[in-house]
């Protein structure tokens, strides 16, 4: 008997192992069943190909199937099934989490007062969102720009899109990652001081401000699960977190803005993508602005930009319940007008018909109460979701998807008057009068416009001119840079897009190789910096638009932290200029754009 027991045990183990093996989900089969229709040729609009998805790690794909963009498709899959699909798509097994000890600094100098020296915080280098860095903070002249050289590079593991824009202050660079890691790097060398792990990817720029308890400074940011965070700027220690919207499609893409002890947060969504699944009950998300106590994270007020609560609104052609009104996501950071006691937000398209009156609008919302003071809808009737086939969720008369993705800019012109400058994916730009309920002062067309821009993520303004980069990512002639006179909207100059670097000598070009300028641009006195879809970081003369410096990111980089890294398209976030250095995030895996995973820093020898 003593001889038979091990044999029986071995048989049981083998049987159990065989049974488990038989039950292991087939990731390839699940992909073919659930995903191939959209992610293999001919595919659908905006869905990345399987090859493009291969740059993501399995964890990121599991997250997308659980509570991200593909949550509807993954809703009835088991955990092992989601993992099997993710491993198949990624082409690799689940790996370790990001190693934040790589490239660690040997010493940690005190942060001190990070706002006492040159800095860039938040999205637009200030609450007015001008994306103009004055000379005392830039410490870089037009004459010096041609001498910029690469000083350091940092690679981001398991990353295909460098969503976030850096914040630089007190000799530190703060940035969030696609995997939720928020890091503090040394701005001069690129070594890492500390890291903090958010619960989801961080797409926003980070805002920095003094703590109310006089214990240093705090960093504020949001993630793609609609959580807002406050952490200590010197240590990365968590101060508080707050979920500001419970809708499953909600996310935060615009940088929070700190003003007078309050943190103002805008909320966007991916529901227009979720609704591409015919089984999704469309649609119930509404864009909103939330005011939080910066010290505690407690909610002070919340304002949905569509006042009416979504409810049953008829049935689809298939007899399913339809809901509405919905949409008007706010993709960008709010703009503070302290003198008038309001903040300005730019809203996106509606998801349902009839399109809400506040979709595709510029809105003024009172800082103290959240009351809507006025709005100006610049594109009415724009009801849009991502449609495929005979999806009953699709609006009968779909709009052009011409949301506002860029923050409004509040500028005081050289004549002392204020102007609110806005740019839209339609390709139209406007000067609005903040004193007359946002009345239109001038219009200028910067590009033909499309669902991917037009003006996609951001423009720059000084006291005489506004500078607009044209995306045109899915138009025949993408790219181009315009300068217009602030007082009149008249064109001062137009710079033709240069030939794409990714299609240069010895290069094949191919998918995602074009001159689109979807990324936000940045101005300093005499210079405009632009990052292109072709992988080129360029500096232009603010007087003529002529290119005075170019850096080609289409290559692999030796990194401070040893993580393999390569350049690619620049999209969404823009260059940041502080204390004689230029910082840029490179890589953006989306429709018509190419992946990358590197943060680059340039300076003078």
Question: What is the predicted role of each segment?
Answer:
Residues 102-151, 305, 309-310:
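Blade/loop signatures of beta-propeller domains
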Residues 46-47, 127-134, 158-164, 183:
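Short, solvent-exposed loop/turn elements at domain surfaces
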Residues 142-157, 182-202, 208-216, 220-250, ...:
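Extracytoplasmic/lumenal domain signature
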Residues 23-41:
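Sequence/structural segment immediately N-terminal to covalent heme-attachment motifs in c-type
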Residues 23, 134-168, 173-174, 196:
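Asp/Glu-centered strand-loop micro-motifs enriched in Gly/Pro and often flanked by an aromatic residue
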Residues 1-4:
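N-terminal secretory signal peptides that target proteins for export/translocation
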Residues 37, 47-93, 342:
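Extracytoplasmic electron-transfer domains, predominantly the class I c-type cytochrome c fold
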Residues 7-19:
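Bacterial N-terminal signal peptides
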């Amino acid at each position: 008997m003593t001889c038979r027991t091990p044999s029986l045990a071995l048989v049981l183990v083998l049987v159990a192992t065989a049974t488990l093996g038989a039950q292991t989900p087939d990731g390839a089969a699940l992909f073919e069943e659930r995903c191939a229709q959209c992610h293999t040729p001919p595919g659908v609009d905006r869905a990345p190909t399987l090859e493009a998805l291969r740059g993501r790690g399995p964890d990121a794909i599991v997250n997308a199937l659980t509570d991200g963009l593909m949550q509807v498709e993954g809703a009835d899959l088991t955990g092992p099934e989601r993992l099997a699909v993710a491993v198949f798509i990624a082409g690799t097994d689940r790996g370790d989490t990001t190693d934040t000890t790589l490239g660690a600094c040997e010493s940690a100098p005190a942060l001190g007062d990070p706002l006492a020296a040159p800095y860039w915080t938040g999205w637009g280098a200030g609450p007015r969102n001008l994306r103009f860095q004055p000379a005392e903070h830039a410490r870089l002249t037009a004459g010096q720009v041609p001498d910029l050289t690469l000083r350091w590079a940092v690679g981001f593991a398991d990353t295909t899109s460098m969503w976030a824009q850096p914040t630089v202050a007190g000799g530190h660079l703060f940035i969030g990652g696609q995997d939720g890691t928020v890091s503090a790097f040394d701005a001069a060398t690129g070594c890492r001081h500390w890291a903090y792990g958010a619960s989801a990817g961080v797409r926003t720029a980070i805002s920095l401000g003094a703590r109310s308890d006089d214990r240093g400074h705090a960093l504020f940011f949001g993630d793609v699960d609609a959580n807002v965070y406050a952490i200590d700027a010197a240590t990365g220690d968590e101060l508080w977190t707050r979920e500001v919207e419970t809708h499953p499609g909600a996310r935060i893409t615009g940088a929070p803005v700190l003003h007078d002890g309050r943190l103002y947060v805008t909320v966007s969504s991916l529901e227009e993508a979720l609704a591409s699944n015919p089984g999704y009950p469309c649609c119930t998300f509404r864009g909103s602005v939330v005011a939080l106590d910066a010290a505690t994270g407690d909610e002070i007020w919340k304002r949905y930009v569509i006042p009416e609560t979504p409810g049953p609104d008829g049935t689809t052609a298939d007899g399913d319940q339809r809901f509405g009104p919905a949409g008007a996501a706010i993709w960008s950071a709010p703009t503070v007008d302290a003198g008038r006691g309001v903040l300005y937000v730019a809203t996106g398209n509606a998801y349902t018909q009839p399109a809400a009156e506040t979709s595709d609008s510029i809105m003024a919302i009172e800082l103290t109460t959240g009351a809507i003071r006025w709005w100006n809808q610049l594109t009415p009737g724009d009801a849009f979701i991502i449609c495929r086939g005979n999806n009953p969720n699709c609006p009968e008369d779909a709009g052009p998807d011409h949301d506002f993705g860029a923050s409004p800019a509040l500028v005081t012109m050289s004549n002392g008057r204020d102007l609110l400058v806005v740019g839209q994916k339609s390709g139209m730009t406007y000067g609005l009068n903040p004193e007359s309920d946002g009345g239109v002062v001038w219009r200028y067309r910067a590009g033909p416009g499309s669902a991917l821009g037009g003006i996609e993520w951001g423009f720059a303004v000084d006291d005489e001119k506004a500078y607009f980069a044209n995306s045109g990512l899915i138009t025949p002639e993408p790219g181009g840079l315009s300068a217009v006179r602030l007082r009149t909207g008249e064109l001062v100059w137009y710079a033709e897009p240069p030939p794409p670097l990714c299609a240069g000598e010895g290069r094949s070009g191919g998918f995602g190789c074009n001159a689109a300028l979807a990324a936000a641009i940045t101005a300093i006195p005499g210079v405009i910096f632009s990052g292109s879809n072709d992988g080129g970081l360029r500096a232009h003369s603010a007087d003529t638009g002529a290119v005075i410096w170019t850096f080609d990111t289409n290559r692999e980089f030796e990194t401070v932290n040893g993580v393999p890294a390569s350049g690619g398209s620049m999209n969404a976030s823009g260059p940041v200029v502080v204390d004689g250095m230029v910082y840029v995030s490179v890589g953006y895996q989306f429709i018509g754009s190419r992946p990358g995973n590197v943060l680059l820093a340039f300076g003078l020898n």
